[in-house]
Amino acid sequence: MSFTDKQEALVNSSYEAFKQNLSGYSVFFYTVILEKAPAAKGLFSFLKDSAGVQDSPQLQAHAEKVFGLVRDSASQLRATGGVVLGDAALGAIHIQKGVVDPHFVVVKEALLKTIKEAAGDKWSEELSTAWEVAYDALATEIKKAMS
């Protein structure tokens, strides 16, 4: 099944909703990650020495990058049917930080919860599926770059 124009539009519109409250949704995203995997705190330089998830420019920049990469994956999937990493160093960075397969599952869950929060009454299974497909394609490419 190919990624449709509608799926791309759903990802784009909910990404814009996410960016409307980047500070709040960034804190929400990392709070969900640490609730699921407290040990993951050490993977993020902007969290490892803090008492908890505190808003910061680094936290917002990283969240915006993660969500932006998934949005870009949606665009690539619709246009070409595949995803190519724009940053070849992503694999090496994830290896250096100690990221392992279960971390991708935790991030996916946190991403979906955050988008659900941002989308509000526009949340739907169709929206969830669009984000899941785009995230899974991105995660697959990052994992390939890690091997």
Curated annotation (Swiss-Prot):
InterPro entries: Globin (IPR000971), Globin-like_sf (IPR009050), Globin/Proto (IPR012292), Leghaemoglobin-like (IPR001032), Leghaemoglobin_Fe_BS (IPR019824). The modification Nitrated tyrosine is found at residues 25, 30, 135. Heme b binds at residues 45, 65, 94, 97. The modification Phosphoserine is found at residue 45. Induction: Locally down-regulated by cadmium (Cd), thus leading to nodule inactivation and impaired biological nitrogen fixation (BNF). GO terms for cellular component: cytosol; nucleus. It comes from the Eukaryota. This is Leghemoglobin 6.
